[in-house]
């Protein structure tokens, strides 16, 4: 993902599912090189607190906007002008399809979506895969790395 961000010169990235901040740190390190920012959403307050500390320790807290709350509620609260050119999804698997539908109005014309655990949680994310497949705006591939990831490109 670090390479995607640098190659695409990403300016505004969104992470749905912060957890302890591990993925967000890698995203933020790449965004520091592009001059971009990361917005990251986590439901659990304790995880968000740990992530904030990890962002600070790793020196990326200046490019990270952590938001604690339900991803669907947070996404619904975004201003219509808030746009993202990269989205990483690694949260409640059954909600992936909802996240996809909710983020589409906030994507730039050439946005990239990366969704984790596509193979390991196939039954829970099948409706998401079907939605991406049915959407003519997106081309996608499923990469058979551990857990599996779906990479969808709008354009």
Regions found by a protein language model. Give the residues of each.
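S-adenosylmethionine/decaboxylated-SAM
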Residues: 2-155
